[in-house]
């Protein structure tokens, strides 16, 4: 698990290789990632947008931007957390993701950015 706190928002990420959905013979590797977002501020916030930088050891870097996460614009009161799971496909056995969430403070409408810590996706080594 990797964790980072920015502007009072704690973001934790875990990953796993999805062997049943991958096809290594065709350079297709699926990884799931689980994210937990905790509001450690004394005020309510709302997640508005996400920005991902996805790196693949064969294909290089790609950018993904979008509204919210998994179709949601979660609102987190002080002390609350929000968890979700998503997936990423790579063309190789090794890659990484990092990014930024844009949040809004509901008491005054100001927006701020929160770092999503870099996390690595690697196919587990098999012992013979």
Where are the model-predicted features located?
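Low-complexity, acidic Ser/Thr/Pro/Gly-rich terminal tails and inter-domain linkers that flank the onset
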Residues: 1-28
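A generic structural micro-feature
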Residues: 25-29, 44-46, 75-80, 93-95
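Short, solvent-exposed loop/turn segments enriched in Ser/Thr/Gly
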Residues: 29-34, 98
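Asparagine-centered strand-capping/turn motif at beta-strand->loop junctions
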Residues: 37-41
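Short acidic, flexible loop segments centered on an aromatic residue
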Residues: 44-62
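Short, surface-exposed linear segments at secondary-structure transitions and domain or protein termini
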Residues: 56-59, 72-81, 121-128
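Intrinsically disordered, low-complexity Pro/Gly/Ser/Thr-rich segments with frequent PxxP/GP/PP motifs
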Residues: 62-94
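Terminal connector regions
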Residues: 89-128
